[in-house]
Amino acid sequence: MKMNFVEPWRGRRAAMRKLAGSVVLVAGRALAQRDAFGGAAPACVLTPRQTEGPYFVDERLQRADIRSDPSNGTLRSGVPLALVMRIAALSGGRCEPVTGAIVDVWHCDAAGVYSDVDDASLRTKGTAFLRGYQLTDAHGQVRFTTIYPGAYRGRAVHIHFKVRTNRGDRATEFTSQLYFDDRLTDRVHERPPYAGRASRRTRNGDDALFRAGGRSLIVDARQDGEGYAAAYDVGLRGA
């Protein structure tokens, strides 16, 4: 069934907490409420930053469909994933859309490989598959077409994201990661091109990064044809 993101989302409510520093940045899942997505904004749920990891590359590659490698046009194979994120600013107890924010996403392919990396384990320098950024629209939304991430030793299945804004004379940056329910990943990774590869060794609860706030970073995902549609809210708050 095709998913329409202009619907109520389901999620969990958490208590708001303040972060130290001149700028407070928060990220959170959408809450169960009657407001339609794109209408009244949900309350923000505070979750921790997470590391950008060793494989962030500031490609400055603006595109919605990140499946291809710009160097040769080839698509990375995998189960389709439509990812929608909404960026909002907490103001007066409401999350108002943030327009013009740069939202980068990057993740590994079905084999657990990142693009544009040259280290002891990966030799993909010069490629840029599964990387890109979008600017938030009038509703604070960005949409990406990608594939469901693969797995590699030591990490739960995840997508990295970075939000950069320039509000007045103050630039802010928030970096974190998105996760998936283990049961969903189990189903997806039974399908090609994931199936037949080394078994997924690290589940969410076995990943130290996930244990540091990852439960509130799990996307809301639903089946969408042959693939999945996933949604997540991120909020920014000024002190």
Feature-to-residue mapping (PLM):
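Low-complexity, intrinsically disordered Gly/Pro/Thr-rich segments
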Residues: 209-223
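N-terminal secretory signal peptides
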Residues: 1-14, 19-27
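Aromatic- and glycine-enriched pocket-lining scaffold segments that form the walls
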Residues: 228
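Beta-strand-dominated extracellular/periplasmic modules and repeats
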Residues: 37-212, 231, 235-239
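Exposed beta-sheet edge/beta-hairpin loop segments within beta-rich domains
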Residues: 150-152, 220-225
